[in-house]
Amino acid sequence: MNNSELKTLIKKQKTNYSLDQEFYVSQHIFDLDVKNIFSKQWVFVGHISRIPNYGDYFLFNIGKESIIIIRDKDNAVHAHYNVCRHRGSQICLENEGNSKVLICPYHAWTYNIDGSLKGARLMDKDFNKNDWHLHKCNSKIFEGLIFINLSDHPNDFEEFIAPTKKFIEFHGLADAKIAHRQYYPTDGNWK
């Protein structure tokens, strides 16, 4: 599907009707969604109850990016790109788990939960570990809900959350727990 076909598809969309099938299955439309929505806006990725303990983590994959959401020993939540700074390998290969350090399976570079480089084998003596931390992903927690933003210059979170703030606060989600999760594989995108 090209942009001209997409414009035609949008023009023929009827108000108050469900979207045409292409909006759910087209790779081109999904790529545009990632570029224009998910790469620029705050995105809800999960609830803090999903990572209750020190070292608990889960991955959130968005487009071609994989983000590690992990809790440290002070209960702070960090979001890092799941990419080793050495050779670009993915660090966490499991979708969720617990780890007190993040170890790249390729050359065993080791990172602290805060993203700082803890160890890198066989590097020159003038190698500065402080220059090789994991890339952080913008993140905020509001009422127990974890949000990330992939943009280098994210829009203001307070402005983003303002229209729904009172509704979210009313439900006391900071104290909520996930009772059960179920995965349903589908041949479609996020819509």
Regions found by a protein language model. Name each.
Residues C84, C104:
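Short cysteine-rich clusters marking metal-coordination/redox-active sites
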Residues Y81, S89-E94:
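Aspartate-rich (DDxxD/NDxxD/DxxxD) Mg2+/diphosphate-binding motifs
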Residues Y57, H78-Y81, V101:
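Residues immediately within or flanking Cys/His clusters that coordinate Zn2+
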Residues E94-S99, G115-G119:
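Short cysteine/histidine-rich zinc-coordinating motifs and their immediately flanking basic loops
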